């Protein structure tokens, strides 16, 4: 009888953590050493339904626990989430996290990692931040130090990687509606940004989408020859009409802050795309480079995906993505 290995993760979501979860679970299933069961979790407001929409992942369905019920204490328990949510449910417990996008983490994250037997992060940046984190907890009445908080459990880096059967340089370009819509723009040179548009005003959101748009307008305003910028993004983490209108509204708000009527074009790619469609976007001849002004990434999966089509990546030189860029 194989050891029971239960993995709690956002397996069915359209998210970076969802992609990480699917890759991880697939790899463990292929070891054929464990009885793998999946406990699906949500990931913020990101939409569900990835497995249903992508038949090549349907094999995961037979591993999903019915009604979310854990049959017994597993020999191995793993969670793919942020560390403050880690709980030791199994006889041996593993926490998987992309980690941290800054230089300092919350002490509750260290507490969560200390509850596990092993912690696995996506980048050297994340590992270093956790190893260097040290805090003092004080009594609020006496101001006396009641405990020192530091990482006491092992932490290792497991590189996320990409599926080279999907993300690759295409020998033959597709002929479909998506390809034709990108082809229809008048510009011959376009940048691409791919990622969520997180909370905050211009310069405040972590992935810096607002500042990217502002900088793009300011850099190429009044130029005779202007490139385009494609944004594959969402704000409410969905593919709804409401979300699309919210993205368009924010772009227009930023556009109004630029002192010119002669501005470059920004095009929005909105909705749910398959991995194959994303790779087709990467390979489109009008897409010349990926750009991201991100303030920090635990890993930065789209940046790695894009490198496989042999085009330049323009981004900040700090945090998780410098492991591979």
Q: What is the predicted function of each stretch?
A:
Residues 20-22, 27, 164-280:
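Conserved catalytic-core segment of nucleotide-activated headgroup transferases in glycan assembly
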């Amino acid at each position: 009888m194989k050891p029971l290995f239960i993995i709690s993760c956002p397996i069915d979501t359209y998210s970076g953590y969802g992609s990480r979860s699917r890759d991880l679970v697939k790899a463990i299933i292929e070891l054929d050493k464990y009885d793998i069961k999946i406990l699906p979790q949500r990931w913020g407001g990101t939409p569900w339904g990835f497995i249903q929409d992508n038949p090549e992942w349907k094999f995961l369905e037979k591993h999903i626990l019915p009604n979310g019920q854990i049959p017994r204490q597993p020999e191995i328990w793993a969670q793919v989430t942020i560390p403050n949510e880690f709980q030791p449910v199994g006889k041996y417990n593993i926490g998987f996290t992309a980690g941290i996008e800054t230089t300092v983490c919350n002490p509750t994250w260290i507490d969560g990692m200390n509850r596990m037997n092993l912690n696995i992060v996506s980048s050297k940046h994340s590992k270093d931040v956790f190893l260097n984190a040290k805090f003092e907890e004080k009594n609020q009445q006496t101001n006396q130090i009641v405990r020192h908080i530091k990482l006491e459990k092992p932490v290792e880096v497991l590189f996320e990687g990409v599926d080279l059967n999907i993300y690759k340089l295409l020998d033959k370009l597709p002929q479909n509606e998506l390809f034709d819509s990108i082809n229809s723009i008048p510009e011959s040179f376009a940048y691409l940004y791919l990622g969520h548009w997180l909370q905050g005003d211009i310069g405040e959101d972590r992935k810096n989408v607002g500042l990217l748009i502002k900088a793009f307008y300011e850099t190429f305003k009044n130029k005779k020859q202007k490139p385009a910028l494609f944004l594959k993004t969402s704000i409410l983490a969905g593919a709804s009409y409401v979300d699309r209108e919210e993205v368009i509204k924010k772009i227009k708000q930023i556009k109004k802050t630029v002192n010119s009527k002669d501005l470059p074009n920004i095009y929005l790619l909105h909705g749910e795309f398959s991995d194959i469609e994303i790779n087709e976007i990467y390979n489109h001849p009008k897409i010349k480079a990926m750009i991201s002004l991100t303030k920090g990434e635990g890993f930065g999966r789209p940046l790695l995906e894009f490198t496989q089509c042999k085009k330049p990546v323009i981004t900040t030189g700090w945090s998780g993505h410098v492991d591979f860029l």
